[in-house]
């Protein structure tokens, strides 16, 4: 492969990455804790887009904090795992070229 082809490949990768990022924005990852008493949803960019807390937790601050931390951590992990998968898929597509 010569260097003129490499530029075209890189441009193609940039375009594919932009398309994946745009699609990823619409992906929603939801995590729950406390048997569903706390639910958080993140978009693919890692932005918190929804938070639900059962009314019964409003009287128990400590439990709410624990459930909230658990749900948030699980949500962040799901977003990161999705990002890794997208990156590996993109690299796999590049290797095929």
UniProtKB/Swiss-Prot annotation:
Pfam families: YbaB_DNA_bd. The keyword DNA-binding applies. InterPro entries: YbaB-like_sf, YbaB/EbfC. Keywords: Cytoplasm, DNA-binding. SUPFAM superfamilies: YbaB-like. GO terms for molecular function: DNA binding. Coiled coil: none annotated. Binds to DNA and alters its conformation. May be involved in regulation of gene expression, nucleoid organization and DNA protection. Belongs to the YbaB/EbfC family. This is Nucleoid-associated protein HPP12_0031.
């Amino acid at each position: 492969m010569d260097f003129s082809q490499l530029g075209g490949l890189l441009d193609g990768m940039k375009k594919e990455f932009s398309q994946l990022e745009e699609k990823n924005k619409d992906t929603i990852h939801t995590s729950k804790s406390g048997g569903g008493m706390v639910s958080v949803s993140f978009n693919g960019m890692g932005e918190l887009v929804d938070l639900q807390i059962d009314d019964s937790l409003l009287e128990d601050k400590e439990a709410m904090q624990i459930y909230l931390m658990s749900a948030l951590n699980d949500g962040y992990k799901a977003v990161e795992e999705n990002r890794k998968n997208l990156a590996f898929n993109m690299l796999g597509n590049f290797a095929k070229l």
